[in-house]
Amino acid sequence: MSATIASLRESLCSETTPLPIRFRALFSLKHLAVQNKGTADSLSAIDAIAAAFASPSALLKHELAYCLGQTGSDAAIPHLTQVLEDLQEDPMCRHEAAEALGALGKAESLGVLQKYLHREGEDVSVKETCEIAIDRIEWENSEERKQEKLRQSDFASVDPAPPMPEDDEKQTVETLEKKLLDTSLPLFKRYRAMFALRDLASPPDLPTAVPAILALAKGLKDESALFRHEIAFVFGQLSHPASIPALTEALSNLDEVSMVRHEAAEALGSLGDEEGVEETLLKFLHDKEKVVRESVIVALDMAEFEQSGQAEYALIPEVASKAS
């Protein structure tokens, strides 16, 4: 293991390291795992990320699972499967592990995802995530996928669902909003509409950007907490000021589930240089929900980073310079 990876692993796994530093270490390790795919360094980085699943922080663990899903590496599958199978684990982490297995797109994960989709008494967000992940893996390995024409996205993330294909009639914000909010459609199809709307909102000066943001914001009223949290996540990716009112409302609603509120806090962190955002986040620094408190700490660190003009939210200079 390289000295860099060993040092990042130590920062990530230490409970005495401040949470924002642990997050930066995590993003640095994810970057190294992706850049060096297939090498011993990549495997060491993946093992380093997985080692932090011993942490008591649900926020950190759910982010570990997300990052493992973004590595594109089969070496992450056993770690993620173990988290999904651990019924003592926080449902937020288990859901993220299921989503990450979907992102990796390997048919070998279908069995375990089917198991928890149909498990009696399973948490709804875990069930729904398994349903979407199964659909994503089946799509990933289908003939249909090869025929589809997908718009080039501005985002490098591997998403829970691809955007709607471009050849699916003429895509307008209105037609996509209709699909987004149609609860009779499978979640996978609605997610496809969500990511197509995201892509119509970037770059932020597109004429479709603000209408797409306002359409997405309506999804924050959906009955599915999983769906609402994904809308907040997309807003974090877009960092568009038009989403601030909807995100502030979601974070401020104490009756909203913590899975959604924490995602809204992190999304606001990506908008940290906008007026009033830091003040909003500071109000929730002592929230009753630990995951919200921790998200606010990370969001405030991200806000500081946004204001500083640094190139990349990572820990080590060489990762920052490579990633920028």
Swiss-Prot record:
Entry-linked Pfam families: HEAT_2
Catalytic activity: [eIF5A protein]-deoxyhypusine + AH2 + O2 = [eIF5A protein]-hypusine + A + H2O
Entry's EC annotation: 1.14.99.29
Entry's cofactor comment: Binds 2 Fe(2+) ions per subunit.
Enzyme class of the recorded protein, top EC level: oxidoreductase
Stretches forming HEAT-like PBS-type repeats: 60-86, 94-119, 189-219, 227-253, 260-287
UniProt xrefs under Gene3D superfamilies: Leucine-rich Repeat Variant
Keywords linked to the UniProt accession: Cytoplasm, Hypusine biosynthesis, Iron, Metal-binding, Monooxygenase, Nucleus, Oxidoreductase, Repeat
InterPro entries: ARM-like, ARM-type_fold, Deoxyhypusine_hydroxylase, PBS_lyase_HEAT
Co-factor requirement: Fe(2+)
Residues reported to bind Fe cation 1: 62-63, 95-96
Cellular component GO terms held in the UniProt record: cytoplasm; nucleus
Function: Catalyzes the hydroxylation of the N(6)-(4-aminobutyl)-L-lysine intermediate to form hypusine, an essential post-translational modification only found in mature eIF-5A factor.
Sequence similarity: Belongs to the deoxyhypusine hydroxylase family.
Identification of the protein by name: Deoxyhypusine hydroxylase
Lineage, opening ranks: Eukaryota, Fungi, Dikarya, Ascomycota, Pezizomycotina
Name of the gene: lia1
